[in-house]
Amino acid sequence: MTLDYTEIGKRIARRRKELGLKQSEVEEKADLGYKYLSNIERSISIPSVEVIMRLAVALDTTPDEFLIGTLSHDNQEWKNISEM
């Protein structure tokens, strides 16, 4: 399976906009550097697995939504893991 980083960036941007958040707000919540989220959303930067996980927590979803475009069936289990 090949990851499409353009689609990942679009999914992250879509989720952020659904929640009505600015890029700077998400960067702060996910402890990302200035403009890094912008670069991810525009496919300039490729996020690590750790960054995708932090973005999922910041955007109240699972990494699955960004990586494959669907929510995990057990969102509560992911929330428990992410709080560890």
Regions found by a protein language model. Give the residues of each.
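Recognition helix of helix-turn-helix/homeodomain-like DNA-binding domains
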Residues: 31-46, 68
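Residue-level signal for the short linker/turn that defines the boundary of a DNA-recognition helix
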Residues: 3, 10, 20-21, 47-50
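DNA major-groove recognition helix of helix-turn-helix/homeodomain DNA-binding modules
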Residues: 31, 50-65
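Short, charged recognition helix plus adjacent turn
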Residues: 67-84
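Short coil turns linking two alpha-helices in DNA-binding domains
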Residues: 22, 33-36, 48, 62
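Short basic helix-loop element that most often maps to the first helix and adjoining turn
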Residues: 10-27, 82
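A detector for short, charged/polar N-terminal pre-domain segments
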Residues: 1-7, 76
